[in-house]
Amino acid sequence: MTTAPTTTAATIAAGSVPAPAGPAGAVRLRSRLDRELPHRFARSAATPESSHLRTEDVAGWLDERRATHRFQVDRIPFAELDGWSFQQDTGNLVHRSGRFFTVEGLRVATTSGPYRQWHQPIIKQPEVGILGIVVKEFDGVLHLLMQAKMEPGNPNLLQISPTVQATRSNYTKAHRGADVRYLDYFTDRSRGRVLTDVLQSEHGAWFYRKSNRNMIVEALGEVPLHEDFRWLTLGQVGELLRRDNVINMDARTVLACAPFSDAEGVALHSDTELLSWFTSERARHDVEAELIPLNQVPGWRWGERSIDHEDGRYFSVVAASVQAGSREVSGWTQPLFEPKGLGMTAFLTRRIDGAPHLLAHARVEAGFKDTVELGPTVQYTPSNYAHLTERPLFLDTVLNADPSRIRYEAVHSEEGGRFLNAESRYLFVDADETDAPLQAPPGYLWVTPYQLTRLLRHNHYLNVQARTLLSCLTSGAVRL
């Protein structure tokens, strides 16, 4: 007698996904696409309130979680790091377990951009983590299970994060701490239906070839609710994205990968033209990025409390002591990168024959696995360019934009687990033919939001800054 295959945790752990079976074990084919899924997310984005937690009560819930747990971050000298040390031969900053991450040196040579050669510290974290959001329908509307999570680098410490935000070292408990809540929904296929699962890059200026799984899983059955978690509609998250420093970077990158409706169905450039242009951009840029010992990085000064560029630009490497009662481990020390100044990140937008378009930039960052990813029109930190005569294209259009042209503006922090007080001002700015012609300069192309979200079904097409801005579109925080 033939029996239908079953999905087990062991099967999934081995990397095998059984074929769906029909009666008497016959193989059953299914539709390759769930055409209803984008509409379900759109309905959630159009729902600004929930019976689980009113949007106006989110701030109070976050305050209550802050009061419940002890959160504190103090700068410390490198000598007070517990479990971290500078290797004697390389100077690399490493953890005694060999896990988590290391701070090493990077030598870069490129054929484009204002800098053609440079050296810098870089975070090497080869482990692939999980950034995952559990979703479930209540009263016909998808809700997202979001977490109030403390990260030491966040300016306000506590922000709203995905259901699961964990490195492999964390969820395999290299820190010997508590289990990661709700992890099984992302490691055991019997617990839910995968809606999105794709590798995406982290900050290419500060990470060396770092990727995380960005996942959305629809839960099967009841989901127990912990006090540090709440169900929110996508529309509620969109409203919170209009506020400064509420939704963290990891939540934003996952939300950008959510299925998105193609309302117009047309674009200035076909999908094939977009892919061909992007492939040519990757092919024409030569980037050599080589890891070197941290103690061989020229132009950087070592102190007891920080490693700084000799001109005071870019970022510093610092150390911190952390207390966080709600985390898997309640206290630890770690290195952090601290950028110099507030960044600015913006998409120029135009309606072309009625269809909204964004001006994407094929951006080179030394830490990318594939040299180039699509970024916003402008991605800029003023102090990094203060000494240069060359300024980013379209920068003045953004800086001098009339307030009536600014469709969206908010300050969001970057990855608070590795970066201290790293913030950027994110904008959508309307442009016209004078500001940004349809015939874009080399390295730029007009694309629709839907074309970008389609690319997010695949690895390493859009950088994390572009994904933050796309999350504002998928959630309804801004409508073009």
Each predicted region: which residue ranges?
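An N-terminus-focused feature that recognizes amino-terminal "leader" regions
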Residues: 20-142, 151, 267-325, 329-331
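Generic structural motif recognizing short loop/turn segments at the entrances and edges of beta-strands
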Residues: 67-75, 82, 97-102, 114, ...
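Mixed-charge (acidic/basic) macromolecular-recognition segments
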Residues: 2-3, 12-52, 142-144, 152-285, ...
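Aromatic- and glycine-enriched beta-alpha-beta binding-site module
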Residues: 103-172, 317-386
